[in-house]
Amino acid sequence: MVRDLSFSGNRAIDDATLRMSMATSRSSAFARWPLVRGLGFLGEKKYLNETQFRRDVLRILALYRRSGYREATVDTIVRRTDRDVYIRFIIEEGEPVRVTSFQLTGLGDIVDERRLASNLPLRVGDPFNLLLLQSSADNVRALLRNRGYPFPEIFEGYDVRLEQHTADVSFTVSPGPRVTVDSILVTGTETIEESVVRKAISVHAGDVFDESRLFRSELNLYRLNLFNFASVGIADSLEREQGDTTVTVHVRVSEASLHRLRLGGGYGTIDCFRVLSGWTLYNFLGAGRTLDISARFSKLGVGEPTDWGFQNNVCPALSDEDSVRLRLNYNVSVSLQEPFFLSTRTSAAVTFGAEQYTEFAAYLRQSIGGSFAVTWRTPFEVPITGSYSLGRAKTEADPATFCEFLDVCRIEDTDVFTEPRFRATFGLNFVWDRANSVLNPTRGHRLTAEFRHASDFLGSDSLIQFTRGLVEFASYYRVARRAVFAWRLRFGAVVAPRLNLESGAERFIPAEDRMYGGGPNSVRGYGQNELGPLVRVLERGTYDSTTGRVDDAAVVRTSASGGDQVIFANAELRFPLPVFAGRLVGAVFVDAGQVAQRGEEAVTLSGIRVTPGVGFRVATALGPIRLDIGYNGYAPRSSRLYKPEEGELVLLAEDYTPDTSGLLGKFRLHFSVGQAF
């Protein structure tokens, strides 16, 4: 068994690239570790093949030759034991052949030849890498095809002088004729109108040929969800003569099913059991429109009207949830989407729906209404969405939150904040997504920004006026062949005007628009909404002001009151584990964050809470199923403690801190689907 495989002397080519060029590889970590290798079934064992091993030396030499190191030599050291083989490749790279001149001719006035040559992958002073030479030629071809020259020819030349370790490189370019699009040919449509295809593509008759527009057109066709296959290219022609200045663009499509039924189910730490269903009709009333009807239900089995007592067994995270919020969550909606609204780059959607949603330990929201959204896809493929929503909504939160922030402590007086009211908001969303996957990204980055504003000018009730902003940036890097390092920064704030209430002029922010923290997708050392301002109510029992403790039989209700400022930072290393055929992925992470309230506290370094943890992910067709365990070494957050007496909340303690639990209580378990970010 190959126990170890290493390299020495390699500087120009890293270990990972060398390993990928070879047939010989070392056994997995579990198969090599002394403590577990004896189990036999853990890890993948790799054995030495003498023939492939000798060929690996030639493969490494060939890689160095192509990379410009013509004098490279490779030696090996093989140490054998009764069970294992230890291999070491000793590489002497030698002096590389370097490019001393790069001449680019034939482009004329199309592009500045000297400037282009200085920006190609292979440049003067670099080792003479044949792979980069080919990549440079491909770059020149792509540039010409995007500027109206679809049939360029490039004659590559180079003169290598091994004794001097120098190479002169030249590209002689024949661009061919500059071409315009004569006509568009569409084939493959059956029930979908040809006009839908023509609206989606980015190339039109009379345009100067641009290959990038052909690729963009294919992407636009797939985004419609109307086609299983789409191809946009130059039509085949046996009669094309040299010097022709026009081409026909051929669009080939194959229609997909125009009906789609979705059914799903799952389990989450906070949602308990959840189900969803949806029916989508594509090309509804023609013109590529989409009609979508969907319904989602969660917290099945833990609240009215499906109270099966699951909070006492399979969903223990909900065991302490207030009965007011322990209800079935639902969202039922009907949406009509117009793919081309005013322009081919703009789409629109009208949605009507009803919702009941409970945010754990925070609030219950019921709403019915509609929204109108317009999305503009910029020339840089960055969608910007503006939306207006109007509905009738009711939000119920713990009366103690109104007592704490608004000094409204009579319980009947807090009813004014929970009455149904009109809610009208304007939203703006920005997404710059360059990650390679939505569910499980391994490289790239993603920037999102969200802005939402509510005011009486838009039709909102006088109590529902605020401005809220949130920005998030995440980045993903491969640090090994299958390991990924990911990090994220998220921050936001919400402000509201002063309103004249009975308690005085106060800034009221609705509970559903406040900032919360803690949980599987933010700071995992805390439970859902545990990070940030809290408020506690003594429902039963007594409080001793001398000791600052409640009696053993006391029942204290904890609610998250939220804040108006938030910042999160996360770092996570994801790496494959050598079990279950590589479908199990491990993770180590560190989360940091703070939720603050102006006037009470500010976002500071000392206030930021840092929690480490470990996790596991199992790859499935629907995305990774995730189990995370976060460790919280901090004492419980202190808060005000109230007690209801004769219809009023009486303050018992300004800074009440519950008793700390044992070591086990410092860990938080989170189970969900998809990566944390």
Where are the language model's segments positioned?
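Periplasmic polypeptide-binding modules associated with outer-membrane biogenesis and secretion
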Residues: 1-273, 278, 292-310, 315-330, ...
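One face of beta-strands
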Residues: 9, 74-76, 154-156, 230, ...
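Short hinge/gating elements
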Residues: 42, 123-124, 296-298, 317-319, ...
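Conserved helix-loop functional segments at active or binding sites
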Residues: 122, 203, 223, 281, ...
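Repeated loop/turn-to-beta-strand initiation elements of outer-membrane beta-barrel proteins
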Residues: 228, 259-261, 272, 284-291, ...
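C-terminal outer-membrane beta-barrel translocator/porin domains of Gram-negative envelope proteins
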Residues: 259-262, 266-273, 280, 298-301, ...
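Transmembrane beta-barrel wall of Gram-negative outer-membrane proteins
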Residues: 321-420
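A short, conserved beta-to-alpha structural element at the edge of catalytic cores
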Residues: 609-634
